[in-house]
């Protein structure tokens, strides 16, 4: 039995000096979170009494008016956090505030789970976060009385190795933690500072947090309510709160998962792209809560970077936290939550794309390039992501899915054709497309920077390989078998380009890898392609721009055998004076520079380009 009239002094079971070094260092570098921890503990105490009262009605005297109260005494330089929750007795104080590695509330949560009553939410970190109070306080007093008991107790410590417990006076159950603030912590006596901290960290604690009589939080965790109970206006208001945005959410995803890891997610897809969407840090903006207590709004292991446009909350009572609550442990439960949430988001986007294609096209314009990052970063879900990707194409102004593209493939078409570049408008006008348009073969127009990179990881879709129309042979011969007779007749009538090709190779030398007749050109005289097996034209350009490739590889110059310029030059190349023909030599370089310009590049030698152009024009006049 404890003598109720004697003040007792104890040593902490874990060296407090070492603990406070941790608390004051990297784990608790942001001092304001001490208030979050104390409010969280107060909320836990109220939750615990609310549950106990279900089976012990005599404890229910405060069950309908649980609250957390903050009080400031500027003269005494104290800040107090009070609750009317379960309270503590002498033994609880020894266990929870005298032992670092143990938590009475944690033990209660384990017992709760063993009774399979997972609908009662508790968080089990009391006794750990409590010590963050010593970051700002030179002494901490805890006055408490356990529900259903008559004795009150006062715990006190300066955090220097010992604490005392003595009888106290308290009229009702609950706990008051009083911080005697250090000289450098006077900011926490200011009401505006306290309001800001509560708004930031404890807005959705399910009990009111009051300063005097003013409620500082909404005391309503909207995500814990049934989806049908939440109005569109309430969703918009909450979205504005968690996102600091002013648009309306494009889509709402409210999901509750019960199983291995219980969690609730309330996520919003914005209708406008956030300003920081493409910042290098690629931060997540989904807030992580543990039982309605805010933990972090940039937990990299909660939401993949390719879903960083999401706003909202994920709340779980099953996560374990480290001593600071600033960093999550390497907890496999968090990985399971991440996978569950990610799959749900991708599933919802797939439904939205099928139900409202036009609406989804607007989403894709805002967030498509970001979502496609997942094709590189998330191999496990790559197929799901690819299903909901959309692409511009030569067919119409609308974006298309790969499945729809394949449904429109021509007879004999065994590849998904694409052209990539920086500018969507320019690549849509590329001469490389001419032969494909002539045969009504659809080509995807890829203008996002990420496109060239995911194509290095994904080589096919539904059995059809991706093929760039700026690399290798055009492969148009086998498409539309019925047109082969016409193609054969055209080839028979095509001029002999052998002499011209030889002359161009001789003049251009190492500037080109090869010169060939083209089957992809119908209107333009020439184009440049990468040879089969070489780096694609656009990827090479990107690598050079970022300093990852020094020298460009020579490309293949393709000639349109039906173009008047080519036929005239072919005739000229047959002459006996072709080897010394200045106009033919100038024309060779002009054709190469024309192909470069069509690809969005500049002539190799602008001054020579101008001279040659002037010379050829002069000869023609």
Swiss-Prot record:
Spans annotated as B: 326-541
A GO cellular component entry from the record: cytoplasm
Compartments where located: Cytoplasm
InterPro entries attached to this UniProt entry: HATPase_C_sf, Heat_shock_protein_90_CS, HSP90_C, Hsp90_fam, Hsp90_N, Ribosomal_Su5_D2-typ_SF
Region of interest called C, as start-end residue ranges on this chain: 542-621
UniProt keyword annotations, A-Z: ATP-binding, Chaperone, Cytoplasm, Nucleotide-binding, Stress response
Record GO terms (molecular function): ATP binding; ATP hydrolysis activity; ATP-dependent protein folding chaperone; unfolded protein binding
Gene3D superfamilies per record: 3.30.230.80, 3.40.50.11260, Heat shock protein 90, C-terminal domain, Histidine kinase-like ATPase, C-terminal domain
Taxonomic superkingdom: Bacteria
Assembly: Homodimer.
NCBIfam families cross-referenced by the UniProt entry: PRK05218.1
Functional description taken from the UniProt entry: Molecular chaperone. Has ATPase activity.
Family note: Belongs to the heat shock protein 90 family.
Descriptive protein name: Chaperone protein HtpG
Organism: Roseobacter denitrificans (strain ATCC 33942 / OCh 114) (Erythrobacter sp. (strain OCh 114))
């Amino acid at each position: 039995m404890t003598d109720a009239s004697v003040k007792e002094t104890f040593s902490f079971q874990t060296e407090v000096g070492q603990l406070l070094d941790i608390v004051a260092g990297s784990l608790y570098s942001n001092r304001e979170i001490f208030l979050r921890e104390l409010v969280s503990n107060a909320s836990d105490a109220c939750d615990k009494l609310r549950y106990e009262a279900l089976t012990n009605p005599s404890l229910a005297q405060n069950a309908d008016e649980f609250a957390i109260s903050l009080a400031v005494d500027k003269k005494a330089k104290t800040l107090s956090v009070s609750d009317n929750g379960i309270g503590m007795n002498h033994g609880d104080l020894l266990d929870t505030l005298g032992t670092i590695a143990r938590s009475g509330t944690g033990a209660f949560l384990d017992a709760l789970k063993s009774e399979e009553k997972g609908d009662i939410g508790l968080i089990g970190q009391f006794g750990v976060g409590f010590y963050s109070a010593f970051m700002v306080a030179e002494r901490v007093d805890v006055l408490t009385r356990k529900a259903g008991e008559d004795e009150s107790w006062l715990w006190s410590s300066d955090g220097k190795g010992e604490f005392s417990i003595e009888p106290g006076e308290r009229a009702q159950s609950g706990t008051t933690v009083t911080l005697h603030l250090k000289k450098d912590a006077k900011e926490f006596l200011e009401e505006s500072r306290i309001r800001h901290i509560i708004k930031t960290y404890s807005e959705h604690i399910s009990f009111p947090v009051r300063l005097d009589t003013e409620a500082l939080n909404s005391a309503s965790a909207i995500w814990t309510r049934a989806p049908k109970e939440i109005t569109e206006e309430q969703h918009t208001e909450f979205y504005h709160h968690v996102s600091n945005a002013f648009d309306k959410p494009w889509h709402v995803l409210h999901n509750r998962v019960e199983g291995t890891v219980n969690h609730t997610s309330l996520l919003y897809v914005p209708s406008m792209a956030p300003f920081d969407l493409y910042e290098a840090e690629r931060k997540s903006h989904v807030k992580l809560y543990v039982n309605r207590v805010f933990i972090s709004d940039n937990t990299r292991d909660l939401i993949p970077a390719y879903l960083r446009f999401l706003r909202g909350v994920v709340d779980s009572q099953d996560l374990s936290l480290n001593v600071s609550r600033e960093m999550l442990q390497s907890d496999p439960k968090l990985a399971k939550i991440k996978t569950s949430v990610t799959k749900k988001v991708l599933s919802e986007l797939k439904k939205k794309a099928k139900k409202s294609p036009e609406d989804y096209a607007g989403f894709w314009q805002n967030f498509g390039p970001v979502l496609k990052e997942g094709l590189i970063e998330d191999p496990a879900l790559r197929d799901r992501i690819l299903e909901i990707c959309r692409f511009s194409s030569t067919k119409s102004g609308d974006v298309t899915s790969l499945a729809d593209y394949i449904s429109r493939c021509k007879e004999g078409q065994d590849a998904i054709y694409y052209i990539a570049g920086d500018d969507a408008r320019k690549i849509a006008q590329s001469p490389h497309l001419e032969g494909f348009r002539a045969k009504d073969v659809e080509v995807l127009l890829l203008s996002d920077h990420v496109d060239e990179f995911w194509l290095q990881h994904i080589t096919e879709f539904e059995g059809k390989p991706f093929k760039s129309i700026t690399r290798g042979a055009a492969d148009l011969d086998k498409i539309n078998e019925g047109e082969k007779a016409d193609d054969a007749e055209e080839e028979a009538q095509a001029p002999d380009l052998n002499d011209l090709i030889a002359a161009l190779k001789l003049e251009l030398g190492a500037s080109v890898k090869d010169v060939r007749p083209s089957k992809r050109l119908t209107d333009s005289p020439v184009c440049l392609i990468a040879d089969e097996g070489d780096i694609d034209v656009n990827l090479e350009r990107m690598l050079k721009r970022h300093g990852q490739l020094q020298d460009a590889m020579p490309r293949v110059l393709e000639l349109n055998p039906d173009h008047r310029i080519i036929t005239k030059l072919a005739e000229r190349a047959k002459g006996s004076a072709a080897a010394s023909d200045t106009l033919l030599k100038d024309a060779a370089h002009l054709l190469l520079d024309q192909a470069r310009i069509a690809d969005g590049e500049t002539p190799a030698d602008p001054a020579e380009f101008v001279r040659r152009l002037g010379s050829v024009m002069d000869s023609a006049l």
